[in-house]
């Protein structure tokens, strides 16, 4: 009688001799090179905005899509610098920056659209783009003096430099005002000592906006915070080994270390002791622009799931024809479209000068949680294929989860919204 081990060995050998599953390989190739159409007439975009999406999407399919899965698996974007310069040539790195510094002079809606399309191809590269274009460049645009803008913006906008923002610390995440990084005045410099943690683009950044305590006795503590522009290579500034993250792999993140790091007083961004105003006003726009990330991830889930449901067969028909699968398609699509309308409308309002803290928190709260659910639904639709790494569904889920944590957790966003309503009744 054949033993169980012998039978298992026969089955394994037989399986290994089979040719690759054509439906699986074919679908992966198909999804790499084509996207579902996005109806921007429904989304309320003008012709220039529609063209922007199409141009960016076409560029990304050629220059980023073929690498997206490898970037995630290796946790490394090998040609990051080259790609960044290509984004600079495309004109999207300084999309909200004035033309005089090499920017495109467009609005936050356009920034969201680019963030969405990059995240549609790679959530990790989208996150790095958001940190560069909004957290770094836009902060210098909004708060820098003319000398600072002329010095830093052109190279950040061209892609020669990579930018970052450093706010969080190991024990100061949501409670960011409790930061411990200290900046002590000595002559015409400030000497920084301490560290920052979870810093997106940290290992790669040439220019960083860094928040530090210049007055540890200030009451309230927020009045003692100042923003600085720090350059890679400044003596006393170093980066630790990049972190091995659950998702957003290839968007390099690390700890920043400051050991008697001398930063010129001329590099104060905004005004001494007014860093909290730079921080909080920038945080609203950070949350808005980063909300484009979950939109892109949700669209990517649909890009892969909808065609699969109309190719895979079970019980003699395409599984997309089963009512339960139709329900999932409807749920995923309506979540995406509801999020899009909210994000786009808040972006339009900000472009018109009406930017509210509760809605900037609201757009990323809702879109982030919807993205996680849509990614879970996508995995369920693909069944076993959704759970193997030949398909990118697991990547979408891991990337989506970051947006419930970064730029303020979902819990903090709910507090922000609730407090805004409470303030109306004081």
From Swiss-Prot:
<feature type="binding site">
    <location>
        <begin position="165"/>
        <end position="174"/>
    </location>
    <ligand>
        <name>FAD</name>
    </ligand>
</feature>
<dbReference type="Pfam" id="PF02770">
    <property type="entry name" value="Acyl-CoA_dh_M"/>
</dbReference>
<feature type="transit peptide" description="Mitochondrion">
    <location>
        <begin position="1"/>
        <end position="32"/>
    </location>
</feature>
<comment type="subunit">
    <text>Homotetramer.</text>
</comment>
<dbReference type="Pfam" id="PF02771">
    <property type="entry name" value="Acyl-CoA_dh_N"/>
</dbReference>
<keyword id="KW-0274">FAD</keyword>
<dbReference type="GO" id="GO:0008470">
    <property type="term" value="F:3-methylbutanoyl-CoA dehydrogenase activity"/>
</dbReference>
<dbReference type="GO" id="GO:0005739">
    <property type="term" value="C:mitochondrion"/>
</dbReference>
<feature type="modified residue" description="N6-acetyllysine">
    <location>
        <position position="241"/>
    </location>
</feature>
<feature type="binding site">
    <location>
        <begin position="380"/>
        <end position="384"/>
    </location>
    <ligand>
        <name>FAD</name>
    </ligand>
</feature>
<keyword id="KW-0285">Flavoprotein</keyword>
<feature type="binding site">
    <location>
        <begin position="198"/>
        <end position="200"/>
    </location>
    <ligand>
        <name>FAD</name>
    </ligand>
</feature>
<comment type="pathway">
    <text>Amino-acid degradation; L-leucine degradation; (S)-3-hydroxy-3-methylglutaryl-CoA from 3-isovaleryl-CoA: step 1/3.</text>
</comment>
<dbReference type="GO" id="GO:0005759">
    <property type="term" value="C:mitochondrial matrix"/>
</dbReference>
<feature type="binding site">
    <location>
        <position position="312"/>
    </location>
    <ligand>
        <name>FAD</name>
    </ligand>
</feature>
<feature type="binding site">
    <location>
        <position position="277"/>
    </location>
    <ligand>
        <name>substrate</name>
    </ligand>
</feature>
<feature type="modified residue" description="N6-succinyllysine">
    <location>
        <position position="318"/>
    </location>
</feature>
<keyword id="KW-0007">Acetylation</keyword>
<dbReference type="InterPro" id="IPR034183">
    <property type="entry name" value="IVD"/>
</dbReference>
<dbReference type="GO" id="GO:0042802">
    <property type="term" value="F:identical protein binding"/>
</dbReference>
<feature type="binding site">
    <location>
        <begin position="409"/>
        <end position="411"/>
    </location>
    <ligand>
        <name>FAD</name>
    </ligand>
</feature>
<protein>
    <recommendedName>
        <fullName>Isovaleryl-CoA dehydrogenase, mitochondrial</fullName>
        <ecNumber>1.3.8.4</ecNumber>
        <ecNumber>1.3.8.1</ecNumber>
    </recommendedName>
</protein>
<comment type="similarity">
    <text>Belongs to the acyl-CoA dehydrogenase family.</text>
</comment>
<feature type="modified residue" description="N6-acetyllysine; alternate">
    <location>
        <position position="58"/>
    </location>
</feature>
<dbReference type="InterPro" id="IPR037069">
    <property type="entry name" value="AcylCoA_DH/ox_N_sf"/>
</dbReference>
<dbReference type="GO" id="GO:0009083">
    <property type="term" value="P:branched-chain amino acid catabolic process"/>
</dbReference>
<comment type="function">
    <text>Catalyzes the conversion of isovaleryl-CoA/3-methylbutanoyl-CoA to 3-methylbut-2-enoyl-CoA as an intermediate step in the leucine (Leu) catabolic pathway. To a lesser extent, is also able to catalyze the oxidation of other saturated short-chain acyl-CoA thioesters as pentanoyl-CoA, hexenoyl-CoA and butenoyl-CoA.</text>
</comment>
<keyword id="KW-0809">Transit peptide</keyword>
<feature type="modified residue" description="N6-acetyllysine; alternate">
    <location>
        <position position="78"/>
    </location>
</feature>
<dbReference type="InterPro" id="IPR009100">
    <property type="entry name" value="AcylCoA_DH/oxidase_NM_dom_sf"/>
</dbReference>
<feature type="modified residue" description="N6-succinyllysine; alternate">
    <location>
        <position position="58"/>
    </location>
</feature>
<dbReference type="GO" id="GO:0006552">
    <property type="term" value="P:L-leucine catabolic process"/>
</dbReference>
<dbReference type="InterPro" id="IPR036250">
    <property type="entry name" value="AcylCo_DH-like_C"/>
</dbReference>
<dbReference type="GO" id="GO:0050660">
    <property type="term" value="F:flavin adenine dinucleotide binding"/>
</dbReference>
<feature type="binding site">
    <location>
        <position position="174"/>
    </location>
    <ligand>
        <name>substrate</name>
    </ligand>
</feature>
<dbReference type="InterPro" id="IPR006089">
    <property type="entry name" value="Acyl-CoA_DH_CS"/>
</dbReference>
<dbReference type="InterPro" id="IPR046373">
    <property type="entry name" value="Acyl-CoA_Oxase/DH_mid-dom_sf"/>
</dbReference>
<dbReference type="InterPro" id="IPR006091">
    <property type="entry name" value="Acyl-CoA_Oxase/DH_mid-dom"/>
</dbReference>
<feature type="binding site">
    <location>
        <begin position="222"/>
        <end position="223"/>
    </location>
    <ligand>
        <name>substrate</name>
    </ligand>
</feature>
<feature type="binding site">
    <location>
        <begin position="284"/>
        <end position="287"/>
    </location>
    <ligand>
        <name>substrate</name>
    </ligand>
</feature>
<feature type="binding site">
    <location>
        <position position="323"/>
    </location>
    <ligand>
        <name>FAD</name>
    </ligand>
</feature>
<feature type="binding site">
    <location>
        <begin position="407"/>
        <end position="408"/>
    </location>
    <ligand>
        <name>substrate</name>
    </ligand>
</feature>
């Amino acid at each position: 009688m054949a033993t169980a081990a012998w039978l298992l060995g026969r089955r394994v050998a037989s399986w290994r001799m089979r040719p690759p599953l054509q439906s699986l390989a074919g679908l992966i190739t198909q999804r790499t090179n084509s996207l579902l159409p996005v109806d921007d007439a429904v989304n309320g975009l003008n012709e220039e905005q529609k063209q922007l999406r199409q141009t960016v999407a076409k560029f990304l399919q050629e220059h980023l899509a073929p690498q997206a899965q490898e970037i995630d698996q290796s946790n490394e974007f090998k040609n990051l610098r080259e790609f960044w310069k290509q984004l600079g040539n495309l004109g999207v790195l300084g999309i909200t920056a004035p033309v005089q510094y090499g920017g495109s002079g467009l609005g936050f809606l356009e920034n969201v659209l680019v963030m969405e399309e990059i995240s549609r191809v790679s959530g990790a590269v989208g996150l790095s783009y958001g940190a560069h274009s909004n957290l770094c460049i836009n902060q210098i645009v909004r708060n820098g003096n003319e000398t600072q803008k002329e010095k830093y913006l052109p190279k950040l906008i061209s892609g020669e430099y990579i930018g970052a923002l450093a706010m969080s610390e190991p024990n100061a995440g949501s409670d960011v005002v409790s930061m411990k990084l200290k900046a002590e005045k000595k002559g015409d410099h400030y000497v920084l000592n301490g560290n920052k943690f979870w810093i997106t683009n940290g290992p790669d950044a040439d220019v960083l906006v860094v928040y530090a305590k210049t007055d540890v006795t200030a009451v309230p503590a927020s009045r003692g915070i100042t923003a600085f522009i720090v350059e890679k290579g400044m003596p006393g500034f170093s980066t630790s080994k990049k972190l091995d993250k659950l998702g957003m792999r290839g968007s390099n993140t690390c700890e920043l270390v400051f050991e008697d790091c001398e930063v010129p007083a001329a590099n104060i961004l905004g005004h001494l002791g007014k860093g909290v105003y730079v921080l909080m006003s920038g945080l609203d726009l950070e949350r808005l622009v980063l909300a484009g990330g979950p939109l892109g991830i949700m669209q990517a889930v649909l890009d892969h799931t909808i065609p699969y449901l109309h190719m895979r067969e079970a019980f003699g028909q395409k599984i997309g024809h089963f009512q339960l699968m139709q329900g999932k398609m409807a749920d995923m699509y309506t979540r995406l479209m509801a999020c899009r309308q909210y994000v786009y409308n808040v972006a339009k309002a900000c472009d018109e000068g009406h930017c509210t803290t509760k809605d900037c928190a609201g757009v990323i709260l809702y879109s982030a949680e919807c993205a996680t659910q849509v990614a879970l639904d996508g995995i369920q639709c693909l069944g076993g294929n959704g759970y193997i790494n030949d398909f990118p569904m697991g990547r979408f889920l891991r990337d989506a989860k970051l947006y419930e944590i970064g730029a303020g957790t979902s819990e903090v966003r709910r507090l922000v919204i609730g407090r805004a309503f409470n303030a109306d009744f004081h």
